[in-house]
C-alpha cells in the first residue's frame, strides 16, 4: 500500500468517528415541557454550563424561548406535512425528535436552522412587546433618515433583531462550540443560516401624517415578517441543501460533489443521505408511513404511490362537518351553514413482513 493510500485512510478515521458519535442533542428544545425558570434551568438535561448560566441570568428570556419552541416545531411540521418524515416530535424525549436527527441529514440541517431562527424570532418579538428587562425596541432607530420615497422619521417600535440574534447565538451555539467534530461544525453553520433567514425578511413599515391623508410626514419602523416567510425560505434551502465533507485540516467544509457550488452562509449543509423513512426503524428514529393519509390524485410527495412506498393503501369512507351555503350579509359578515360531507380517506398500508424492503 502506498503512502497516499495510507494518508487517505488516516484522514478518514476522525471523520468516521465524528459521525458515529455526533453532537446532536439540542436539549434546550425540551424547554417547552418544563415549568418555572429555576426548575427549567436545573432540570433540562444536557444543557452546558454556558447555557445554564444564561438561563439563570435571564429567566424571562428562557420563557420566551420555551414558548417559541411550539411555534417553530409547528412551522417544521407545516413544511414537512406532505413528506414521509413529517417532523414528528416526541414529548418525552429530551431532544424532542428522538433518534431521527442522529444522522447528519438534510432533515437535521433544516431542524437546526428553523430552531435557531425560532429563537431569534421569539426573543425579538418579546423585546418589542416589553416582556424582557434586558431589551426593548431597537435603540439605533432614532432621528431622521431617507429612503427611495424621501425623508422620514424613525418612530414606533422597531424590532430589535440584533439583540435577538446576539442572544440566540450565545445560547443556541454554546453546546456546539464545545465540540470540534464535523457534526458540531455542521450544526453551527445551519444555526447561523437560520438566524440570517429571520433578518432577511425584516421590512420597513411606515405611516403617513398630514392633512386629508397627505404624506407630508412619514414615521417608519422595522418589523419582522410573519414566521411563515422564514419557514418557506428555509424550506427552499432544504430542497437545495448542499452535501459536504470536511476539508483536510478539519476546520471547514468542501462540497462532496465538485460539480456543485461551494455553500454560502445562507445555504444549508449536510453530510449523510437521508433514509427513506418508509418503515418503522427505532435505530434510525423513523416512524414509517403506515397509517399516514395520502393523496390519491397527487403526483407529489404526498401521493399514495410515494407516501406509501409502493405498499398500497386502504380506503375508508368518513363523514365530516364542513361549512357550506355561505352568504355575505351587509355589513360585514359571512354566514355559513354546517353540512355533513362524506369523503374517501386513503391511508398507507403497513409492511407485509418485518423484513420487507421498500422498492423506492
Swiss-Prot record:
PTM field: Palmitoleoylation is required for efficient binding to frizzled receptors. Depalmitoleoylation leads to Wnt signaling pathway inhibition.
A GO cellular-component term linked to this record: extracellular space
A molecular function GO annotation: cytokine activity
Glycosylation-annotated residues: 295
Keyword Lipoprotein listed: yes
GO biological-process terms attached to the record: atrial cardiac muscle tissue morphogenesis; canonical Wnt signaling pathway; cardiac epithelial to mesenchymal transition; cardiac muscle cell proliferation; cell fate commitment; cell proliferation in midbrain; cell-cell signaling; cellular response to transforming growth factor beta stimulus
Subcellular location: Secreted, Extracellular space, Extracellular matrix; Secreted
InterPro entries, per database record: Wnt (IPR005817), Wnt2 (IPR009140), Wnt_C (IPR043158), Wnt_CS (IPR018161)
Lipid-modified sites (O-palmitoleoyl serine): 212
Domain of life: Eukaryota
UniProt keywords, alphabetically: Developmental protein, Disulfide bond, Extracellular matrix, Glycoprotein, Lipoprotein, Secreted, Signal, Wnt signaling pathway
Residues in the signal sequence: 1-26
Protein function: Ligand for members of the frizzled family of seven transmembrane receptors. Functions in the canonical Wnt signaling pathway that results in activation of transcription factors of the TCF/LEF family. Functions as a upstream regulator of FGF10 expression. Plays an important role in embryonic lung development. May contribute to embryonic brain development by regulating the proliferation of dopaminergic precursors and neurons.
The protein's name in its UniProt record: Protein Wnt-2
Amino acid at each position: 500500500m502506498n503512502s497516499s493510500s495510507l494518508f487517505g485512510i488516516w484522514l478518514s478515521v476522525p471523520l468516521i468517528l465524528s459521525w458515529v458519535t455526533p453532537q446532536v442533542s439540542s436539549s434546550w428544545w425540551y424547554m417547552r415541557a418544563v415549568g418555572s425558570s429555576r426548575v427549567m434551568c436545573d432540570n433540562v438535561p444536557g444543557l452546558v454550563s454556558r447555557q445554564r448560566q444564561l438561563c439563570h441570568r435571564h429567566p424571562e428570556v428562557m420563557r420566551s424561548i420555551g414558548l417559541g419552541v411550539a411555534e417553530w416545531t409547528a412551522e417544521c411540521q407545516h413544511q414537512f406535512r406532505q413528506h414521509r418524515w413529517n417532523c414528528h416530535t416526541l414529548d418525552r424525549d429530551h431532544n424532542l425528535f428522538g433518534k431521527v436527527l442522529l444522522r447528519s441529514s438534510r432533515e437535521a440541517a433544516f431542524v437546526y436552522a428553523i430552531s435557531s431562527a425560532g429563537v431569534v424570532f421569539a426573543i425579538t418579538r418579546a423585546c418589542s412587546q416589553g416582556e424582557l428587562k434586558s431589551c426593548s425596541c431597537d435603540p439605533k432607530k432614532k432621528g431622521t433618515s431617507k429612503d427611495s420615497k424621501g425623508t422620514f422619521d424613525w418612530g414606533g417600535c422597531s424590532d430589535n433583531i440584533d439583540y435577538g440574534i446576539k442572544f440566540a447565538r450565545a445560547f443556541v451555539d454554546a453546546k456546539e462550540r464545545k465540540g470540534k467534530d464535523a457534526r458540531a461544525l455542521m450544526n453551527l453553520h445551519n444555526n447561523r443560516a437560520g438566524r440570517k433567514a429571520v433578518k432577511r425578511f425584516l421590512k420597513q413599515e411606515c405611516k403617513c401624517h398630514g392633512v386629508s391623508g397627505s404624506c407630508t410626514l412619514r414615521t417608519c419602523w422595522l418589523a419582522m415578517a410573519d414566521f411563515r416567510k422564514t419557514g418557506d425560505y428555509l424550506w427552499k434551502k432544504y430542497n437545495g441543501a448542499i452535501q459536504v465533507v470536511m476539508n483536510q485540516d478539519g476546520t471547514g467544509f468542501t462540497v462532496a460533489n465538485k460539480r456543485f457550488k461551494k455553500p454560502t452562509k445562507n445555504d444549508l449543509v449536510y453530510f449523510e443521505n437521508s433514509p427513506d423513512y418508509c418503515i418503522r426503524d427505532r435505530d434510525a428514529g423513523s416512524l414509517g408511513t403506515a397509517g399516514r393519509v395520502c393523496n390519491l390524485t397527487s403526483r407529489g410527495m404526498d401521493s399514495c404511490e410515494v407516501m406509501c412506498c409502493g405498499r398500497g393503501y386502504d380506503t375508508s369512507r368518513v363523514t365530516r362537518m364542513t361549512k357550506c351555503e355561505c352568504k355575505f350579509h351587509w355589513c360585514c359578515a359571512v354566514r355559513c351553514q354546517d353540512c355533513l360531507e362524506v369523503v374517501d380517506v386513503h391511508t398507507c398500508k403497513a409492511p407485509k413482513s418485518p423484513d420487507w424492503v421498500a422498492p423506492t
